[in-house]
Amino acid sequence: MYYKVILGIESSCDDLSIAIAIDNKIVTTKTKSSSSVHANYGGVVPEIAARYHEEILHQTLNEALTEANLTINKIDLITYTENPGLLNCLHVAKVFANTLGYLLKIPAQGINHLYGHIFSPMIDDGDCLYQKSDLIYPALGIVVSGGHTAIYDVQSPSKITLLDETLDDAIGEVYDKVGRALGLQYPAGAKIDQLYNPEQAETVEFLKTNKLSAFSYSGFKSAVLRYIELNKNQPDFNLVQAVSSFQKFIIDDFIDRIKNVINKADSKYQTILLGGGVSANSYLRSELKELAIKTLVPKPIYSGDNAAMIINYAQYLLNE
């Protein structure tokens, strides 16, 4: 089914994003974050994030409509993040989308936030990184963010199966907790990646083993935080050595798990689809590109939560 003008709304966590697509191309994306507010708490406070979304949603929508040179009655379909996410935050987009859909007499379609991330490399904003033919099924979908770290079997847009996921902390969450302990500004992932030096990436031993038996990062996180607490005020503490050793350990472990999935699948996967906030990490991207499978990665502006990915995934479902 074809819809000329599609509105997208994303509000699953601390970002509020509005996007508009015309004729299957994203023409505007407006994303606003409340991360500066949450920085005082070292993490996202759901009630504060939801209130922030409510306060700026109308203004952000008007900005998007103005940039797209549209009036609101030109919208043919509304897409919004339905799950997963923070319930208070999800509620904002759901109520707004369904109310607006009722008033305009147009459909409102809820979209899975994680599947939006999986297909985010394929977002077409007039300067698409890849051709649709670059995505060959079956694909391996990878989501790595502050809330989720998971690996999926992607047979088609509507046939996605979870293969493996962390038992506890997502990688992005560990980055933020480590960054907070080091006094880095929230969210800390980008700063840690910026400080990363491969020549100093094996100088700190957080654990007595270089392998984790389970797909779990809570124990490793505790070990890193314990090391920081004991050493950060020492005169010989080296920040670059600490963050480089941390990043190499956790990304290498994740890459090994991806390799295990690929090997067990007997090389059936033709493409890797990478999405989520941590997908912008330079070391993760470089390691994935070393694999013998074509890896599709999103533009940095689409690696975090955004409404363009919600529209994009909805379009893939509609075009099946």
UniProtKB/Swiss-Prot annotation:
Binding site for Fe cation: H113, H117, D305
UniProt xrefs under SUPFAM superfamilies: Actin-like ATPase domain
Catalytic activity entry: L-threonylcarbamoyladenylate + adenosine(37) in tRNA = N(6)-L-threonylcarbamoyladenosine(37) in tRNA + AMP + H(+)
Protein's GO biological process: tRNA threonylcarbamoyladenosine modification
Main location per the UniProt record: cytoplasm
Molecular function terms, GO-annotated: iron ion binding; N(6)-L-threonylcarbamoyladenine synthase activity
Cofactor annotation: Fe(2+)
Pfam family, one: TsaD
Keywords: Acyltransferase, Cytoplasm, Iron, Metal-binding, Transferase, tRNA processing
Amino-acid positions noted as binding substrate in the UniProt annotation, renumbered to this chain: V143, V144, S145, G146, G147, D176, G189, D193, N281
EC number, as in UniProt: 2.3.1.234
Gene3D superfamilies the UniProt entry points to: 3.30.420.40
InterPro entries documented for this protein: ATPase_NBD, Gcp-like_dom, KAE1/TsaD, TsaD
Localization (cell): Cytoplasm
GO cellular component: cytoplasm
EC category: transferase
Cofactor remark from the record: Binds 1 Fe(2+) ion per subunit.
HAMAP family assigned to the protein according to its UniProt record, in alphabetical order: TsaD
Physiological role: Required for the formation of a threonylcarbamoyl group on adenosine at position 37 (t(6)A37) in tRNAs that read codons beginning with adenine. Is involved in the transfer of the threonylcarbamoyl moiety of threonylcarbamoyl-AMP (TC-AMP) to the N6 group of A37, together with TsaE and TsaB. TsaD likely plays a direct catalytic role in this reaction.
UniProt-listed NCBIfam families: gcp_kae1, T6A_TsaD_YgjD
Similarity section: Belongs to the KAE1 / TsaD family.
UniProt-listed PANTHER family: TRNA N6-ADENOSINE THREONYLCARBAMOYLTRANSFERASE, TRNA N6-ADENOSINE THREONYLCARBAMOYLTRANSFERASE, MITOCHONDRIAL
Protein name: tRNA N6-adenosine threonylcarbamoyltransferase
Organism expressing this protein natively: Mycoplasmoides gallisepticum (strain R(low / passage 15 / clone 2))
